[in-house]
Amino acid sequence: MESENMDSENMKTENMESQNVDFESVSSVTALEALSKLLNPEEEDDSDYGQTNGLSTIGAMGPGNIGPPQIEELKVIPETSEENNEDIWNSEEIPEGAEYDDMWDVREIPEYEIIFRQQVGTEDIFLGLSKKDSSTGCCSELVAKIKLPNTNPSDIQIDIQETILDLRTPQKKLLITLPELVECTSAKAFYIPETETLEITMTMKRELDIANFF
């Protein structure tokens, strides 16, 4: 009887010892895992992020994701040259003759008029041999009449281009665009003291036509 009691006590002791060993092993494993997390916290975060990212990617996929990946088209933006960027105005927006004008010039603009003139001979007046009429299409000259009172003819400066007439005196300034192209070298000017008027006659540049030359 005593031997049986001894055997049962020995078995209880062995069971308790084995349970203690298992508990100690579990505790040691848990301690090692906790220590590993303390030493390498980023590994766990990376694994969690990878799982979350994978789930979000899978959830965002739809029927449009089936097939080859789409290639994004690149839009080409035309480059503007530095010269164009530095321009304040477009050359087409600048009025003709603006390069001759001076906005700071305070001289007065004189009275003037531009008229068309024909070269008419006796054959045109009495015989009517040509087909000329009174229209501007049959005129061959432009005449500019400019009022310049109290002006010395020697003080008058004139610059005539194909489409520009530029006149300057100490008191007056005139810059006009001519209605027709003219021959610069054909211009003739004379001052009429009685009327204090300057007349400038210019031959127009026109193609040969039957009305003017036949």
Swiss-Prot record:
Q: What subcellular compartments does it reside in?
A: Cytoplasm; Golgi apparatus, trans-Golgi network
Start and end residues of each stretch annotated as Disordered: 1-22, 34-68
Its tissue distribution reads: Expressed in testis, small intestine, prostate, adrenal gland, spleen, lung, bladder, breast and ovary. Expressed in ciliated epithelial cells.
User: In its UniProt record, which GO terms are filed under biological process?
Assistant: axonemal dynein complex assembly; cilium movement; flagellated sperm motility; inner dynein arm assembly; outer dynein arm assembly
Which InterPro entries does the entry mention?
DNAAF6, PIH1D1/2/3_CS-like
Alphabetical GO CC annotations of the entry are: cytoplasm; trans-Golgi network
What is its quaternary makeup?
A: Interacts with HSPA1A/B and HSP90AA1. Interacts with DNAAF2 and DNAAF4. Interacts wuth DNAI2.
Q: Which PANTHER family match?
A: DYNEIN AXONEMAL ASSEMBLY FACTOR 6, TWISTER
The protein's name: Dynein axonemal assembly factor 6
Task: Cite the entry's keywords alphabetically.
Answer: Ciliopathy, Cytoplasm, Disease variant, Golgi apparatus, Kartagener syndrome, Primary ciliary dyskinesia
What's the superkingdom here?
Eukaryota
**Disease (UniProt):** Ciliary dyskinesia, primary, 36, X-linked: A form of primary ciliary dyskinesia, a disorder characterized by abnormalities of motile cilia. Respiratory infections leading to chronic inflammation and bronchiectasis are recurrent, due to defects in the respiratory cilia. Some patients exhibit randomization of left-right body asymmetry and situs inversus. Primary ciliary dyskinesia associated with situs inversus is referred to as Kartagener syndrome. CILD36 inheritance is X-linked recessive. About half of CILD36 patients have laterality defects due to ciliary dysfunction at the embryonic node.
Q: Which family does it belong to?
A: Belongs to the PIH1 family.
Function in brief: Plays a role in cytoplasmic pre-assembly of axonemal dynein.
Q: Which GO terms describe its molecular function?
A: dynein intermediate chain binding; protein-folding chaperone binding
Q: Which organism is it from?
A: Homo sapiens (Human)
Q: Name one Pfam family in it.
A: PIH1_CS
